[in-house]
Amino acid sequence: MPALMPHLLYVSASDKTAPFSSISAALLQAVAGDTVLVGPGRYSPSQTGEHFPLYVPPGVTLVGAGQGASSIDGEGTMEISFRPVREGQSLILLGNGSTLSGFSVLNGGGNGIANQPGARVLITRNEIRRHGQHGLLVSGPQEAVIKDNIFLENGTKRFAPTTPRGVSGRQGHHIFVQGKGGMENRIIIMDNTMTRAFADGLAMVVFFDEADGVVMHVSVINNLIEQSERRGLTIAASFNPSHSRVTVDVRRNIIRDNTEYAIAAQAARPLIAALISESNLCVRIFDNECHNSGDGIALFGGYGPGEGNLLDGTIVGNLITGMKRHAVRVIGGVGYRGHAARHNRVRALVSRNRVEDAGELPIFIQGGASEAQEEAMGNEVLAQVVDNELPALAGKPSFAINDGLPGNVVRLEEPAQAHERMSGVIPYHT
């Protein structure tokens, strides 16, 4: 039987001669290989009778006339969700092999856009703005490419559910990537602009209800991430599962004016009171600019209850300016919320970074600490710190190490940049 020829399905909100007046109707007719071409106009429940989520079938390309020209307006449709964060509570749901390009996607009550778990998708040249929860939810894709988009003011419902650990789990990222068990989890995020998120500009995590052994690789390249109410980038190899294997490359981004951290990476950060063990995070942070946050780049081996987790971090060639506390901060393990952190490790190379106006202490490396009186034992940082340009501080070191609580250690490889080893226990701060 001969293969079906691909079709072009045209949608217009204003041209009465167009075959379709709503995107919903055209997508119901589209099959793999088809392109749904959407003319200028506002497409919404009240204007064109849209039904959300708009499901883009496998292999279908949905193309608008450009940002600001073709607008998909949710008018507050869809709901926030947590544990799980639901892909179906999104204005647009992308099937495997589908593409979304050339739209302003606005005003969803839940998420703006999501992929079906495991789907390979391309999301490019869109504006994604003012959604109640996340701008874009990426769940376990075979491969997702997210390129040349503008994200603005996502997390409008200011949703901050309490996690089982009794801490606030802010929801409202521009892009929320969740690694899924048994899936490929390959994501490329490049050339995007992300401004004013309620939580983080970009969060990449293995969520706490996944099975053990999740593998994920994310590349974050040449993005602008700014003015997030919490962090620019959050990276967590595990919020609960053990044996995760996560690799994240962060290169040539500008990350500025975020409240807490520019980049915070954690091999294990339990959000429920269950032990995480042997999760590995490899994070490579090269040639970024980080400006004006609480801390610049922070690496954490494992929080309690965590044991035997490893973060392998490379921080090279970055410009870090205007931090209130530290430009680079590394801690092997942190006892947390009544639970111990034991035998977690960070291996770190910190080299050829330029630090300006760094606040309290430009580079600070600590073996083990605790939030209150929790145990932290056997945690270790093995670091090579060399050839960084650091400001001179009157009466204070520019680079210091502290073993922390008894039974933890920081080891520096030679050659090592001039530093001070601080005695006693330096208190942990979030």
Spans of model-derived segments:
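Extracellular/surface-exposed low-complexity segments
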Residues: 2, 388-390, 403-430
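Right-handed parallel beta-helix/beta-spiral solenoid domain characteristic of secreted/periplasmic
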Residues: 5, 13-17, 40, 44-47, ...
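Beta-strand repeat architectures
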Residues: 27-34
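Solenoid scaffold repeats with emphasis on beta-solenoid/beta-helix
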Residues: 36, 54, 60, 70, ...
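Extracellular beta-strand/beta-solenoid scaffold signature
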Residues: 48-53, 75-92, 107-114, 130-138, ...
